[in-house]
Amino acid sequence: MTGFGARLAAAKAQRGPLCVGIDPHPELLRAWDLPTTADGLAAFCDICVEAFAGFAVVKPQVAFFEAYGAAGFAVLERTIAALRSAGVLVLADAKRGDIGTTMAAYAAAWAGDSPLAADAVTASPYLGFGSLRPLLEAAAAHDRGVFVLAATSNPEGATVQRAAFDGRTVAQLVVDQAAVVNRSTNPAGPGYVGVVVGATVLQPPDLSALGGPVLVPGLGVQGGRPEALAGLGGAEPGQLLPAVAREVLRAGPDVAELRGAADRMLDAVAYLDV
């Protein structure tokens, strides 16, 4: 078995350093002349799978699938399976976080043998980084990755993430604890525990010792500029995984237009893996 960090590095080397989001917001479905139903959701995802099958990582935003109940989860399962069949690494943007047996249940769903389990999942550390242990253990056992929220782009996040404890910001504590896991499980790197740092964060945490990947959402519509990402938080070359969704998705529903928009963003961030 090959660890997630190595699989991600290989995918980026072969397909480029970009994560493309599937965010089936109702407004986008309407813009694509699709009904805001589970059938419309399925059609939206089918188009996205065809357009993004050649990229390294695709990130479905789980909340937009949950909104359709069981039918939405069924679409998500099929979408994950189709992307993985095309050789794409799938990052489920679920932002799960809890404690004890509940966290263990989330771990089984998103990092175990469940049909929902993707190659990686996002997680929230608000209940304490240690509460993520069941998820981290399940991910390690199944060669999956975990991206833990550290410093997000939304302005509300700063009140918590930049609060200080023991001389470090909360965001830095999250990064440092992720680094401990990576050093203990794969000291030679790359590790399987990454963090999320928004592209528009003005004071990012120090990422130089993380030893794992950094998901950087917020390019394009949200204000993040590809040319401004180099050296984010002291990250090493190849460590960053920029993510884009709406900037690309608004080019749909034509598959070629979607692929072209994603290719242009990939060209803009390709320098990060040089």
Swiss-Prot record:
Pathway: Pyrimidine metabolism; UMP biosynthesis via de novo pathway; UMP from orotate: step 2/2
Gene Ontology molecular function: any one: orotidine-5'-phosphate decarboxylase activity
Location of the active site: K95 (proton donor)
GO BP terms in the entry: 'de novo' pyrimidine nucleobase biosynthetic process; 'de novo' UMP biosynthetic process
Record keyword Transmembrane present: no
Pfam families: OMPdecase
Keywords tagged on the record: Decarboxylase, Lyase, Pyrimidine biosynthesis
SUPFAM superfamilies reported for this sequence: Ribulose-phoshate binding barrel
Reaction(s) catalysed (UniProt annotation): orotidine 5'-phosphate + H(+) = UMP + CO2
KW Lyase (keyword) present: yes
The enzyme's E.C. designation: 4.1.1.23
Domain of life: Bacteria
Family: Belongs to the OMP decarboxylase family. Type 2 subfamily.
Protein name, as recorded: Orotidine 5'-phosphate decarboxylase
Gene name for this UniProt entry: pyrF
